[in-house]
Amino acid sequence: MRQFVMIGGDMRCHYLAAYLKEQGVYVTTYKVPDCEDEYSSWPMISEAFRNDSTVEERVLLLPVPVAKDGIHINGCTELAIENIAGSLTAFDFVCGGVLPSGLTDACTAAGVPYYDYMKDDCVALKNAVATAEGAIAESFMMSDINIENSKCLVTGYGRCGRVLAQKLLRMGAEVTVTARSVEACFKAEIGRASCRERV
């Protein structure tokens, strides 16, 4: 039997846990929003999974991003990356978004395979769309002016910057992009935004 442990995160983790449970998958959640914790602490979870001989494969599902501050698990501030790294032998596979190098190094040292969702171009692009739409929603709430005919600055022209610039242009904004490379500026200008190369 395959079992999943999901830790922290935001409502995306909640919905993923609910979906997996609907599919008949055994999922243990810890500090996932609006999900009931089966265990009261991380050490209890890792020990329970390490000692359960009925489980064929133990998968640890971490949030996107794994750690916003680089130290603690996103949505679970009492749990640090080093706590997870010290318990990896309880698991057969680790998944998460933007896995910190300290965690991937620990996985490699423990012989535990890992997968970073954000290394998948399709997932990263869909995340960029959600991030861009979130930025636009924040701008609506924080500004008294319309986006149409306004001047907007987008710093960077990676996945998120590219999607954000295009959405703002479609909404009628005058968009300027700052980018580190001539190539990124060229791409921004092809997309109808003006561009200033950052030095």
Q: Where are each of the predicted segments found?
A:
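NAD(P)-binding Rossmann-fold cofactor-contacting core
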Residues: 23-39, 171-189
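Glycine/serine-rich phosphate-binding loop and adjoining beta1-alpha1 elements at the start
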Residues: 60-149
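Residue-level detector of conserved catalytic or cofactor/ligand-binding positions
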Residues: 190-199
